[in-house]
Each structure stands twice: as C-alpha cells, then as structure tokens.
Amino acid sequence: KELLDADGDILRNGGAYYILPALRGKGGGLTLAKTGDESCPLTVVQAQSETKRGLPAVIWTPPKIAILTPGFYLNFEFQPRDLPACLQKYSTLPWKVEGESQEVKIAPKEKEQFLVGSFKIKPYRDDYKLVYCEGNSDDESCKDLGISIDDENNRRLVVKDGHPLAVRFEKAHRSG
C-alpha cells in the first residue's frame, strides 16, 4: 500500500514534505538546531512551537520509481537553500544516525551521493512513524525514531524503539 500525505495524495519519490507530528500540541515539524558544541545546526529536532512547520525534507530512494511504499529504504535530506549560511555551500544534507548517541544528524555532502537510505516510513495507528534500519538489514532490526528532550530543551529526533513519534507529511510546495 502506498504512503499518503496529509491531503490523501501519494508520497512522491523526490518530493519535498514537511514532517509534522500527527498529534497536535506536541511541538512542530522537524527542523535543525545547534546542540552541544556545534557551531552550525546539525541536529534534527522537532520545533518547539506547534505553529512552526520546520524545514521541508526531500524524501527519496535511488530506484527510479514514482511512488513510495512502506517497504522502501529511504533517504531524508534538507535543502541547503533553506538553511543558515554555514550550510549553504553543501549540495545536499542527508540524515544519518550517530552511532554512539543514536541521534539523527545531517551529514553535509559536497556532491550528490546515491546511497541506499537507512530509513523507512511505516504505518503507525492512523498515521506513520519513521524507523531507522542499521546497515539496511531486515525489518526486525529497524527501530523507531522518537523524541528525546535534552538539557537545553531541544526535542531531538533519536532512535527510541517502542516510543515512536507519530508523523504526517505535508507537501512543501502546494499547487493552487
């Protein structure tokens, strides 16, 4: 079964979407923040305010297929033009999971790389959840991505199995 956005339209391979919490009142969309000693925002977080949609993420998979379904390994990346100057020199900002902290960060890349992604979108209740599959292994090893609040009150996106962030997808560029 294909994945649908908030309008009920099919998620498109290579489309840009705001990733928003399915439940209102629990923060806004996914964006970037500086955490720890980062001089540039590299950590994927949930916006504090539910009125903030966050940054559009391009969701894609290398096979040239138009429609995304729950079985595909996916890449999520933010576009440099939407970001602070320290990130604008990069052509692409794909998500990755830091091994030790299990946090989702961006890995700035000078040029496009067609790597098979490590993430999947899975149906969850009436919405979706994001999961991380280490080393593109079988579904059994995929773990939920959820929110962990740090000492600076950042709502970090982390591998948090059993406590997923329920999400929905809103087109970043609505026509009409």
From Swiss-Prot:
**What's this chain's function?**
Inhibits trypsin and alpha-chymotrypsin stoichiometrically at the molar ratio of 1:1 and 2:1 respectively.
Taxonomic superkingdom: Eukaryota
Record note on quaternary structure: Heterodimer of an 'A' and a 'B' chain linked by a disulfide bond.
Q: Which PROSITE patterns match?
A: SOYBEAN_KUNITZ (PS00283)
Name under which the protein is recorded: Trypsin inhibitor
> Which gene name belongs to this protein?
ACTI
Q: Which residues form the signal peptide?
A: none
| GO MF term list | serine-type endopeptidase inhibitor activity
Taxonomic lineage of this organism? Eukaryota, Viridiplantae, Streptophyta, Embryophyta, Tracheophyta
Q: Which key words tag this protein in UniProt?
A: Disulfide bond, Protease inhibitor, Serine protease inhibitor
- Keyword GTP-binding tagged: no
Task: Record the organism.
Answer: Acacia confusa
Q: Which family does it belong to?
A: Belongs to the protease inhibitor I3 (leguminous Kunitz-type inhibitor) family.
